[in-house]
């Protein structure tokens, strides 16, 4: 194991929760940016799947 010496510097009781919190924050930020920067994602999350799929299909056909 290459990273075994890391636990000599950082205790596992601190390092593992810190890693999990960092992953959760990164995941939240990715989803937040998707909702803020795309029109269809917000529509999909609000429940209007039909309109979201129509917009997605229209943009695919135009490009």
UniProtKB/Swiss-Prot annotation:
Principal location class: membrane
Gene3D superfamilies hit by this protein: Light-harvesting complex
Periplasmic side stretches: 36-63
A single GO cellular-component term on record: plasma membrane
Cytoplasmic side: 1-14
InterPro entries assigned: Antenna_a/b, Antenna_alpha, Light-harvesting_complex
GO molecular function, one term: bacteriochlorophyll binding
Superkingdom of this protein's organism: Bacteria
Pfam families in the record: LHC (PF00556)
Entry membrane topology: Single-pass type II membrane protein
Keywords of the record: Antenna complex, Bacteriochlorophyll, Cell inner membrane, Cell membrane, Chlorophyll, Chromophore, Light-harvesting polypeptide, Magnesium, Membrane, Metal-binding, Transmembrane, Transmembrane helix
GO biological process terms on file: photosynthesis, light reaction
Function: Antenna complexes are light-harvesting systems, which transfer the excitation energy to the reaction centers.
Annotated family: Belongs to the antenna complex alpha subunit family.
Subunit structure: The core complex is formed by different alpha and beta chains, binding bacteriochlorophyll molecules, and arranged most probably in tetrameric structures disposed around the reaction center. The non-pigmented gamma chains may constitute additional components.
Protein name as it appears in the record: Light-harvesting protein B-800/850 alpha chain
Name of the gene encoding the protein in the UniProt record: pucA
